[in-house]
Amino acid sequence: MPRTDNDSWDITQSVGATALGVAAARAAETESENPLISDPFARIFVEAAGKGMWSIYADPALLTKADDLEPDLRGRLQLMIDFMATRTAFFDEFFLAAADAGVRQVVILAAGLDARSWRLPWPDGTVVYELDQPKVLDFKSTTLREHGAQPKAELVNVPIDLRQDWPKALQEAGFDASRPAVWSAEGLVRYLPAQAQDLLFERIDALSAPGSRLASNVPDSGFTDPDRLARQREDMRRMRAAAAKLVDAEITDFDDLWYPEERTPVDSWLRERGWDVSTATFAELMARYGRSIPQGAQDSMPPTLYVSARRRAG
């Protein structure tokens, strides 16, 4: 179903269901022979949600049937697992580096089923603010506490739609804009219209004291190229049809969730506002972590740029 201006969702619907797909990919990577990451909670989320399109990543029995339906499906699924594994490792390392540098305020925007509050070794005194739709945060917290999990930092849930006045809600929850913070906008930006992207980073910039850090994965150049989009949509259509047969469930059409619009380049925008910025493309990040993109699959993933930044003093 196409997006609307005021749409909302729970964990099994629309954008919320993508969080389960991410969790399923993290579970598959965690349980692989040589995992890049360890997320012991990912499998818990997938099992708590029940059967759905996310099952295809986390159920080895389904993968054995994939080749009979679509020769390229297994490779595409592994590429998605690699994508999520490298993305997760990138953000994990970013957070831990900020913690080592003494930053004790953490803000996770569109937190989804990100379980870093529970699984990363946060230093004493760290406060993690998680922002997302109320139903998404409730599912996560309830599921983890039912399994005896306890956060490894002081966790503050801020249940709010990021299209609303989340800076006000964040500060009312205890966030101190006079102190450095570490921000993440992981798996978020392509689900925002271009104007909403601009507003998001304007708000982050306004709340960031010197020494603050920011990481995000954002649409890269070529994201809106019509020919590339057509190839990606056709590839996704074939994979979605095969996957739907495997799980006997409707598969979300991600084309309906993304906004393929021309956007302000986030890296240059941040540099102009006093941030030191580093970037890596999806292919560069995959290579950094020893993963590769299968031949012929270059267009199956949207062009993505990984951005990490630090706010300079003065």
Swiss-Prot record:
EC top class named in words: transferase
GO biological process, one term: methylation
Keyword check for Chloroplast: no
UniProt keyword terms in alphabetical order: Methyltransferase, S-adenosyl-L-methionine, Transferase
Matches recorded under InterPro entries: Ppm1/Ppm2/Tcmp, SAM-dependent_MTases_sf, SAM_mthyl_Trfase_ML2640-like
Binding, S-adenosyl-L-methionine: 132, 161-162
Protein EC: 2.1.1.-
Gene3D superfamilies noted in UniProt: Vaccinia Virus protein VP39
Molecular-function GO term, any one: methyltransferase activity
SS bond list: none
Any Pfam family matching the protein: LCM
Biological role: Exhibits S-adenosyl-L-methionine-dependent methyltransferase activity.
NCBIfam families in the cross-refs: mthyl_TIGR00027 (TIGR00027)
Similarity remark: Belongs to the UPF0677 family.
Protein name in the entry: Putative S-adenosyl-L-methionine-dependent methyltransferase MAP_0256
